[in-house]
């Protein structure tokens, strides 16, 4: 299996993260699943729900590069799902949306590069296409950072 004997870190602890945790822990060969999220209550509930020694709940914020770097050290794969996701919240608090969805995502990318993770998967949204909201715009910028610069006239990889 793809994740055999590997350690995976998931940022965020929303609906997608819960589904990923369920799937990953179903593989007996998974070494460790780390969940890095700032929601203390959700972290506690998740640890009780799964009650699996391979699950490591880490309270932290992707906007804090040092804490994130510490959490990522030693993992093989990173699944980045941490974000402010409510359109109305991002509209009312654009600075927070930028700090989390753009700067925080950049921190995830930089920490993943500096610790030589095998693969980083960044989750986005359909709202980033022709973005008309602050949320959509921040996710579009996250996508651009993930793709990185490319020579003019070249298409991004498939």
Predicted regions and their residues:
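Conserved residues in the N-terminal Rossmann fold of short-chain dehydrogenase/reductase
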Residues: 37, 58-59, 99
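Helix N-cap at the beta1-alpha1 junction of Rossmann-like dinucleotide-binding domains, i.e.
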Residues: 40-41
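Short, conserved SAM-binding/catalytic segment
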Residues: 45-53
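Conserved Rossmann-fold cofactor-binding substructure of NAD(P)-dependent oxidoreductases
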Residues: 56-77
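Hydrophobic/small residue at the entry helix of a nucleotide-binding pocket
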Residues: 16-17
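Conserved N-terminal Rossmann-fold NAD(P)-binding element of oxidoreductases
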Residues: 9-12
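Conserved Rossmann-fold NAD(P)-dependent oxidoreductase catalytic core, especially the SDR/UDP-sugar
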Residues: 77-80, 84-143, 148, 157
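Conserved S-adenosyl-L-methionine
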Residues: 25-32, 116
């Amino acid at each position: 299996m793809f994740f055999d004997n590997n350690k995976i870190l998931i940022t965020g602890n929303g609906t997608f993260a819960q589904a990923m945790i369920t799937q990953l822990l179903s593989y007996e060969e998974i070494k460790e699943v780390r969940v890095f999220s700032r929601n203390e209550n959700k972290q506690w509930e998740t640890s009780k729900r799964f009650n699996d020694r391979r699950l490591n709940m880490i309270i932290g914020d992707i906007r804090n590069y040092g804490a994130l770097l510490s959490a990522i050290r030693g993992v093989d794969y990173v699944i980045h799902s941490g974000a402010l996701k409510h359109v109305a919240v991002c509209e009312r608090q654009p600075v927070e949306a930028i700090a989390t969805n753009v700067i925080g995502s950049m921190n995830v990318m930089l920490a993943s590069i500096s610790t030589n993770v095998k693969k980083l998967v960044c989750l986005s949204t359909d709202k980033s296409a022709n973005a008309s909201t602050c949320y959509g715009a921040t996710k579009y910028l996250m996508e651009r950072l993930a793709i990185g610069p490319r020579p003019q006239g070249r298409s991004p990889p498939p």
